[in-house]
Structures are given as structure tokens and as C-alpha cells.
């Protein structure tokens, strides 16, 4: 199971680096079209949202590949939160029938929506991010971190 987790984590990290790079280059306009209308204050801001999310995706991808255990787990938990945060863009694509990334039917766009929980699960499971996800859910993450700092002093 250890090697399955490792391989899936490396694949997820590579996927994130690829996706982030595509935000910055060859799929940029398709990502611009996917930005929900409530974030489209201006064309410049919409483009900024796409570019910023691309940089964040690259950082997460590299983080879950190269960071050491505890930092990797934090990166995985943050990546799961990122997947939750960008989910409205996927819903926007479905609701407004936006063709992008080969998703040119409502059925394909709907199927994509069901893959978001899979990505959230993979981010948490392959990195060990469950621990931090649970602490955040209970509102205890910062208390745990400050307790570690106090014990080290």
C-alpha cells in the first residue's frame, strides 16, 4: 500500500504541475472562460485569477512531490481545501454549458463534478493530510501548532 500511495501522490503532483502550467500557457483562455461570473470584475482581474491559480497549482504539485512528511501533509490538506475552493468554477462550467478541456457535453461536465471528491480524497490520503484536515475541521489546528512551538522552547 505504501508504494500505491507514493505512486498516486507523484502522479497527483505531476498532474498539478501540468494543470498549473496549462493555466499559464496553452489552456489559459479556456480557464478564463471557466471563472465564475461573480469573480469577473474586469478582464484583467479574471486573467489574474487564472494566472494566480496556475501558480498555486504548480506550488501544490511541487509541494506534495518534494516536501518532507509533515510539510507534505500540510500541503496535501491545503490542496484539498484548494479543490473545494475551485469547485464553483467546475459547477459554473456545467451550469453555463461552457465547453473546455474536451468537456463539450453536459454529461461529460457532470461526470467531471464527481471527480472533485476523488481529488480531495487523493490529496489527503496520499500525503497524510487527514491529520491536519481533522484538526482544521475541529478548529484546533492553530492550537496544535502553537503547542508544538511552546514545547520546543
Task: Annotate each language-model stretch with its function.
Residues 1-153:
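Membrane-interface extramembranous regions
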Amino acid at each position: 500500500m505504501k508504494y500505491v500511495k507514493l505512486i498516486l501522490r507523484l502522479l497527483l503532483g505531476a498532474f498539478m504541475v501540468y494543470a498549473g502550467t496549462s493555466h499559464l500557457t496553452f489552456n489559459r483562455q479556456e480557464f478564463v472562460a471557466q471563472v465564475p461570473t461573480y469573480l469577473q470584475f474586469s478582464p484583467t482581474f479574471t486573467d489574474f485569477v487564472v494566472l494566480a491559480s496556475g501558480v498555486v497549482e504548480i506550488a501544490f504539485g511541487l509541494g506534495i512531490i518534494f516536501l518532507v512528511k509533515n510539510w507534505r501533509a500540510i500541503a496535501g490538506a491545503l490542496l484539498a481545501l484548494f479543490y473545494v475552493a475551485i469547485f464553483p468554477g467546475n459547477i459554473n462550467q456545467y451550469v453555463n454549458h461552457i465547453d473546455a478541456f474536451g468537456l463539450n457535453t453536459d454529461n461529460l461536465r457532470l461526470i467531471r463534478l464527481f471527480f472533485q471528491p476523488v481529488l480531495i480524497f487523493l490529496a489527503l490520503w496520499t500525503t497524510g493530510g487527514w491529520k491536519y484536515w481533522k484538526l482544521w475541521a475541529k478548529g484546533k489546528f492553530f492550537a496544535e501548532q502553537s503547542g508544538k512551538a511552546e514545547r520546543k522552547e
